[in-house]
Structures are given as C-alpha cells and as structure tokens.
C-alpha cells in the first residue's frame, strides 16, 4: 500500500510549515539533522519544538541565522524577498552543486533540485530573464536552502508516493520586499500556481500566506488533483506558522488510505506530465551552419530548462551546399523573449523566424504499474474513448540493464501489463 499524503493548506503554506508538518508526521529528526549537516552550510542553526496556535498543539521548525533571535520567514519569507541582512547571492548552478555534494539520498537530491527549479523558473518569468541569469538572493539564502532540502529529506524519509494538495488559501493586500511593494499573491507565487495546476483561494487575511518556497514545494510534490471519494486517515501531522492570525496558523498533513478497491498503482513523486489543452503556441526557427555540436547541445539544454515545450534540430543544406542545422523551438507566447535571448546568446545566428501555430494535444498522465520486472512508469493518453499506453523509455532501459534482456522483449512485456485505471 502506497503512502498517500494530503496537505490541507487552509492557512497557506511556507517552507518551514511544510517541514514542521512532515516532522510531526514522524519524519526522523536525526536523519534530517545529519542530512542538513552534510550541506556544509554555515551561519545558521535549527530549532524544533512545539507551540500552540489558537489552542491547537503543533510542531515548529525554525531556521535561526547568525545575529537573529528568530527566523520569521513564514508568510513574510526572507525566502524569496529578502528584507536585508545575509545578502547571499547564488545562482541555480551554485545551489545544485551544494545539493550534489551533500550526503542526502538521491531521491532527496532530485526532489530538492526540482523544487528549486520551480522557484527559479517563476522568478525568471517574473523578471523576464533566463533561469541561469537569476542570482538568487531569494532561494540562494541559507534559510531557504535549508527549508527546501529539509522538506525533500522528510518526504523521502516518510516514503511518500502520492501527494494531493488542497486549494492554497492566500491572503490579500501588499507585502514589502527587496524589489519594492508587491501585491499578494506575489508574482513568483502567481507564476507557480499558473504553471503547475495549483488552485488559489484569496481570503480576507491581510498579508502573504503562501510563500514562493511553499508554493514550489506543493507544485513539485503534487501527483494527483483530487482526494479519493472515501478514505481513512492513518496519521496526522500539524505544522505551525510563525505569525499569530485570527485563525489557527497551521498546515495539516495527513497520511491517508484509499478505501476503494482499485488495482495497485502509484504516481511517482519525482515527476508527472502536465495536461496540455488545445490552443496556441509559437515556433521559433533559425538556420545555423557555423556552430559546434557542443554549443548546439548546450543551447538545447538551456531552452528546455527555461520552459521550451520542445526543441529539435533538423539537418539541412544552406547556400554553397554547406551542411547545417535548423533549430526549431516550440514555446508559449510568454516564453518567446526568453527563448530568443538564449538562442542569440549561445549560438552564432543573427536572425530568428517566428510564427504562431495552433495545435491539438491529447491529455495524458504518467502512472506506475506493477510488472514481472518491477514497477514501470507508463504514459496514458485518451482519444475518442480509446486509451493508449506508452512505457517510459528510461524505465525500460533500466530493466534491460538490470536483467540483460533485449529492449523490445521488455517493452512488449510491459505493454501487455495494462492494469492501470
């Protein structure tokens, strides 16, 4: 039976609240401390304890920086909008290096970097720049690194397989940050909600209830849109916020059990494919005959990291019969400028063609099925009451490497095991 987590965000969500709730669910404190120590970060300490919010007993997780009595990043997170002090500037590569050099589990590393990427993408979109151009005084601060890695470590320790998220209850008004006075929800939160299928619900509470770090955690770990029609509660964890609100400032986390008799299936926490509706997209094209394969590969990576829906090269012949490549990028209207910036910066081209297209895309999801070789992720698409199944290449490759069997044999065997849904 998989561990299914439900986060009830009726007072919003922030990084420290998420960690607190997971610790209260039973995540191992010693494992967490050892994992954080392996990050080799200095200038902070963590405090874990209990406090009451509107009479409700809750766990708290505070990151205290040198020279600070308390760490008040909940709902006014230093997190993503520093108010001064400890001005650490790191880019996404620096943060990935810290994570990769740590001793946390591979699953925790993957999830930590996924959460950071969600924040980075949202901030890049807000500022109109590429992800690798953002210098994260926001998520690069020690307290935010600790919050995000701690959340990933706790989720891994609890062996969470499926995650459902309630509506994110957000405050209203404005909040002061390094960039000035911003409306609530702040741009990064709005971008995360829009890009990741989260639901926002505005309340009368003044100020910020949903922080970018909290929203990014929710976006990165969510695997299902709805709760089961009937479920049992196996365990409850309650995480405390810092601010005192008219209502209980808590985040409740439930380990639940689906009471319906379904075939066993899980959705991987690490990733899932978002459904794409019919609509418009943009195609950017340019012909390149004087670039190295390394630079073209690097450009493709940058484009995909910064939100391109698809990137591909086509071999062509240009004037004077010179062999060349046509670079094609498919993206949303909002990402056109970012894509152009990356192409001009990393290739030798001096011009880009672009045009708007319409497309029809089948809705799909990734689920996990049990096979004779173990669990395999399968992409499931539907069209005119027909369901199509496509085993994930990386899982087939892994099984082939583990068993020594041929690719087609494993692929065919997985295709026969259509026990999803």
Swiss-Prot record:
GO terms for biological process: protein maturation. Keywords: Lyase, Nickel. One of its GO terms (molecular function) is nickel cation binding. It catalyses: Ni(II)-pyridinium-3,5-bisthiocarboxylate mononucleotide = pyridinium-3,5-bisthiocarboxylate mononucleotide + Ni(2+). Its EC number is 4.99.1.12. Involved in the biosynthesis of a nickel-pincer cofactor ((SCS)Ni(II) pincer complex). Binds Ni(2+), and functions in nickel delivery to pyridinium-3,5-bisthiocarboxylic acid mononucleotide (P2TMN), to form the mature cofactor. Is thus probably required for the activation of nickel-pincer cofactor-dependent enzymes. NCBIfam families: nickel pincer cofactor biosynthesis protein LarC. Belongs to the LarC family. HAMAP family: LarC. This is Pyridinium-3,5-bisthiocarboxylic acid mononucleotide nickel insertion protein.
